[in-house]
């Protein structure tokens, strides 16, 4: 985290939240975030508040996502799960729209009135915690899974129609996008991408894409480890879920599969080879089964194994398509000569992970069943 000058926060945003930063000893710290521009404001902020998080929302998210976040976090709070809460601006609204011609207080209504969408800012309460990007500690992963299980369980009875609807996982669409990319003039000329993309599509022929026997549940949408906070004094204990812009309804297989993909790949996304660690599956599903509602069917939890292969192959297809189309993913110019090169490495890594899961499918399925069967009676 890096201290930044106070004038980097637009005056209209400071006014909207009653922040007299130029007249106080408050510090503004730039926090690591891949999507939204995020700042931690610390000091005497009035009304007994010592810290808040200010964020400028990435345009990929609509401002109405805050209606969903408010509904979910209010429900979590009522269920006594710790969660960051949105802080309303001086006009009583959940977000603030700001541009050079905006009302200094900012208003939700300004979003609809402006021809060019203004910047969207929000404030939220600050939950102190440790951010972890990778872990090899089974107890830490089990605790993370327990938190995810409590999170899902608390939202089982949430009656809310999501306003900001984005498909959490649309594997068929991503595979079709790869087919089209391979068939394009640029794709046909790229032998390396052709070979990799064709292999991905071949394995995808055996994927399970239909989970409609299970209900669509309220999911986080991006359960990577860095979207969980851990207690600083007890790093093995998960504290709360953060980064809630991806909330929505979907199948548990995808959510748990994505968590396993992220948590169980020891080499990370920038390696061409990957092997799924079976110990991660046992720790994660055992922890999840301990904390989720007893009524959650074992078959639905065990669908995580199929979801793991599906999500890994889906991401491989997205990276491979972008290596040809070059339209979505960012890349590391300090480590790779081009966006295409970086995306090919990432595609190979996710495909390698999907192959590893496919090879171990029978063993993984057995481990999943054993983990779920061991959950205590409640």
List the predicted regions and their residue ranges.
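ATP-dependent phospho-/nucleotidyl transfer catalytic cores
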Residues: 29-32, 55-64, 104-113, 130-142, ...
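ATP/Mg2+ or Mg2+-diphosphate-binding catalytic cores
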Residues: 182, 314-378
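Juxta-kinase regulatory segment immediately upstream of eukaryotic protein kinase catalytic domains
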Residues: 1-27
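Active-site activation/catalytic loop segments of kinase-like enzymes and analogous catalytic loops
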Residues: 253-294, 310-331
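Conserved ATP-binding subdomain of kinase catalytic cores across diverse folds
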Residues: 29, 34-39, 44, 49-51, ...
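Small/polar glycine-rich anion-binding or flexible loop at a beta-alpha turn
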Residues: 301-311
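Short secondary-structure junctions
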Residues: 15-24, 78-82, 211, 294-295
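Catalytic activation segment of kinase domains across protein kinase-like and atypical kinase folds
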Residues: 226-265
């Amino acid at each position: 985290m890096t201290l930044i000058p106070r004038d980097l926060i637009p005056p209209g945003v400071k006014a909207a939240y009653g922040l007299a930063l130029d007249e106080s000893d408050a510090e503004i710290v730039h926090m690591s975030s891949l999507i939204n521009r995020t700042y931690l404001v610390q000091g005497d902020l009035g009304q007994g508040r010592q810290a808040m998080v200010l964020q400028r929302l990435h345009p990929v998210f609509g401002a109405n996502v805050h209606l969903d976040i408010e509904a979910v976090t209010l429900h979590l709070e009522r269920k006594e799960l710790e969660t960051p809460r949105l802080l309303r601006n001086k006009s009583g609204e959940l977000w603030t729209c700001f541009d050079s011609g905006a009302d200094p207080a900012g208003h939700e209504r300004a979003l609809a009135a402006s021809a060019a969408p203004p910047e969207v800012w929000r404030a939220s309460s600050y939950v102190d915690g440790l951010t972890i990007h990778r872990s090899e500690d089974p107890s830490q992963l089990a605790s993370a899974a327990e938190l995810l299980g409590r999170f899902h369980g608390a939202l089982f009875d949430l009656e809310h129609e999501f306003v900001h609807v984005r498909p959490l996982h649309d594997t068929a669409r991503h595979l079709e996008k790869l087919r089209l990319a391979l068939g394009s003039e640029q794709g046909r000329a790229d032998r390396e991408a052709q070979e990799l993309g064709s292999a991905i599509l071949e394995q995808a022929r055996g994927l399970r894409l239909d989970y409609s026997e299970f209900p669509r549940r309220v999911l986080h949408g991006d359960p990577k480890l860095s979207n969980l906070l851990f207690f600083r004094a007890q790093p093995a204990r998960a504290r709360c879920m953060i980064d809630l812009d991806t909330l929505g309804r979907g199948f548990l297989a995808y959510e748990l599969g994505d968590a396993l993909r992220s948590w169980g790949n020891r080499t990370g996304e920038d390696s061409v080879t990957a092997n799924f660690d079976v110990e991660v599956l046992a720790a994660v599903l055992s922890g999840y089964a301990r904390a989720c509602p007893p009524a959650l069917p074992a078959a639905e939890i065990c669908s995580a194994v199929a979801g793991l292969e599906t999500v890994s192959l889906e991401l491989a297809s997205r990276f491979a398509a972008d290596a040809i189309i070059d339209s979505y993913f960012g890349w590391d110019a300090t480590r790779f000569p081009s966006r295409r090169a970086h995306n090919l490495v990432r595609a190979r890594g996710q495909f390698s992970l999907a192959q590893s899961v496919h090879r171990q499918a029978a063993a993984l399925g057995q481990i999943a069943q054993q983990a779920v069967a061991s959950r205590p009676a409640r």
